[in-house]
Amino acid sequence: MAEIKNYTLNFGPQHPAAHGVLRLVLELDGEVIQRADPHIGLLHRATEKLAENKTFIQSVPYMDRLDYVSMMVNEHGYVLAIEKLLGIAVPERAQYIRVLFDEITRVLNHLMWIGAHALDVGAMAVFLYAFREREDLMDVYEAVSGARMHAAYYRPGGVYRDLPDAMPQYKASKIRNEKALAKMNEARSGSVLDFIDDFFTRFPKCIDEYETLLTDNRIWKQRLVGIGVVSPERALQMGLTGPMLRGSGIAWDLRKKQPYEVYDRMDFDVPVGVNGDCYDRYLVRVEEMRQSVRIAKQCIEWLRKNPGPVMTDNHKVAPPSRVGMKTNMEDLIHHFKLFTEGFHVPEGEAYAAVEHPKGEFGIYLVSDGANKPYRLKIRAPGFAHLASLDEMARGHMIADAVTIIGTQDIVFGEIDR
């Protein structure tokens, strides 16, 4: 009798649907996946080790480069861990700004996810729509920090600076006439907060557009319904978090269960799935974008009414004002010490977790009392998700592997670290 031999296929790392540098070794029986073996490490940059040789504040930009689609949320986990060890209080206004930018980042992440996921499955229009909205949010990043992606905006003790009073405007060029320019700058005549408010006022209609294209689309449902099903029990056993866990019907959200900053004052709902398949995870993330709009609106309302400091006044941790440095010798010394030596963190260890767009992003920080971390451990949500890929893909077709990678919302910056 003829021997049945499985076929081995290398999927990636040069594959457009591999989301970066994923290499999957697929064992196939015809076109059915028997085993999926993810090979990682192609984007390993030793972030945890590099952080041990940098002062606490110098490692903030490294956080942006972990999950390079959800920049500020990575920073948030890191600064929370430092603040726990230092035992410092963050001004209320800074907390609201952080929550606002966490939600802006969540929308940025989910727009990238819905665009890339739809493109992988074969729907191109959504990708173009999503990037149209992302552009506005990238401009907000740029307005507050000077960078479109790697913002380094959060600081231990607060944020780098308050929201600017003026939103940068588009300038005239050869490709834009005055009419087009006026339309583009329509929402940019006020402050950054006005621009964010305007964006979140019109954004729900944009979400409706994506849903019109996908939610009841017959082809979209055929590609997602019943694919990559994870039961609630298995989701917990495999360490899934975020939309991957909520898609399986478990209402676990750190913003509700272990509130940090001012999330306990926010009024929002936690969407959960029923069937635990790719379609439910899609619905959960779309609803998350709608909830982010609610949270952002509440933050904007509070920020308008309550001006105030956005950085702690402890000059051992935060730089003094430039005005003070010109007249006060002590301020100048503090500034010099802070940017040469950094600040010393008391001996101890702390774990801080935030509800990252992809799941639970945790930072475990060990300090030996020096000006650098003794050990920094990053708990990346995508790592556990990728580990579950084999189980989710078994028995499905090769084309479904693409759908499953898309639904996991994998970014290799955080997985390989």
From Swiss-Prot:
Location of the protein in the cell: Cell inner membrane
Molecular functions per Gene Ontology: NAD binding; NADH:ubiquinone reductase (non-electrogenic) activity; quinone binding
Top-rank lineage group of the source organism: Bacteria
The entry's keywords: Cell inner membrane, Cell membrane, Membrane, NAD, Quinone, Translocase, Transport, Ubiquinone
UniProt entry tagged with the keyword Ion transport: no
Top EC category: translocase
Membrane topology: Peripheral membrane protein
Main location: membrane
Subunit structure: NDH-1 is composed of 14 different subunits. Subunits NuoB, C, D, E, F, and G constitute the peripheral sector of the complex.
Family: Belongs to the complex I 49 kDa subunit family.
PANTHER family associated with the record: NADH DEHYDROGENASE [UBIQUINONE] IRON-SULFUR PROTEIN 2, MITOCHONDRIAL, NADH-UBIQUINONE OXIDOREDUCTASE 49 KDA SUBUNIT
Protein name: NADH-quinone oxidoreductase subunit D
Organism, scientific name: Burkholderia multivorans (strain ATCC 17616 / 249)
